[in-house]
Amino acid sequence: TMVPKGSIVLDNHNGTAPGLIMEKKGKIAILLPGPPNEMVPMFEESVYPYLRKKQPEIIYSRMVKICGIGESQVAEEIQDLIEKQTNPTIAPYAKTGEVHLRITAKAENEKKCKEMIKPIVHELKKRFGKDVFATKEEKTLEEAVVDLLKEKNMTLSLAESCTGGAVAARIVNVPGVSEALMCGFVTYTNRAKRKCLGVKKSTLKNEGAVSAKCAKEMAKGGAKAAETDVCLSVTGLAGPGGGTEETPVGTVFMGCCCKGKTVTREYHFTGNRSRIRGQAVAQALTFIRDCLLECR
């Protein structure tokens, strides 16, 4: 077998191609077979132990997820922490409608890393309060919403227009959501808004389908029709056409009816049709969560 001089041969217990580790002038090159069923076991059995000997410290991370406020505001709030950070470190990541903060520590073991990270997580929760929806990397915003619904023993329905059922699609990603989500209405036309949700003809004529009043009536009508504790409505202009000076493309109104009380919000999103709809879905989840936190 042709093996570079001084290299370490890694046995392949799941195939024929061996792996190699080569060291030269402080640099390390690691060659592994391509198929995942060969590469992953080889990494775990041979490469990981080799690297641990080279670097006795481990790196451990934890995520703090925030919704309802933008990346620039989050960055401003934690500027002092970032400026004086050494170990642990905080790294912000922007996602549509969310900001994720990854806190990373380096220490001799996982327990020590967790001890170092804990006060940082505590400080972030203190600064951002209810806007923190998760401190685990795997937890999603829709899971946070469903958890709140179950915790409060409340049911949810959705009345969507411009998002076309995309809010419902996000929520049904969560296993066991049938305990909380009753149904969703996709009322894209004015006729459907009247027939399914009881939106008044006068509202559609005088205020228009893209209005706070329409969003309010959609939410109230959806809650009544579905007999749910909560109903979230979305109506807006995703474009590319249909916008006016008074109601430009990207204008979205949402209503949330929680136990008979309905509040509305107005948003102005930018981007193409897909991006506007994506932002609307993310803000809809945040809106539901906010209403649930305030609903008694």
Model segments located where?
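Short beta-strand elements
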Residues: 21-22, 92-94, 105, 253-258
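Proline/glycine-rich low-complexity loops and linkers
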Residues: 1-54
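Short beta-strand
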Residues: 10-11, 90-95
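A short linear hydrophobic-aromatic micro-motif
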Residues: 86-92, 229-233
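Terminal amphipathic helices with adjacent charged low-complexity linkers/tails
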Residues: 95-119
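Short alpha-helical segments enriched in small residues
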Residues: 112-296
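Short glycine-/aliphatic-rich beta-strand segments at the starts of folded cytosolic domains
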Residues: 54-70
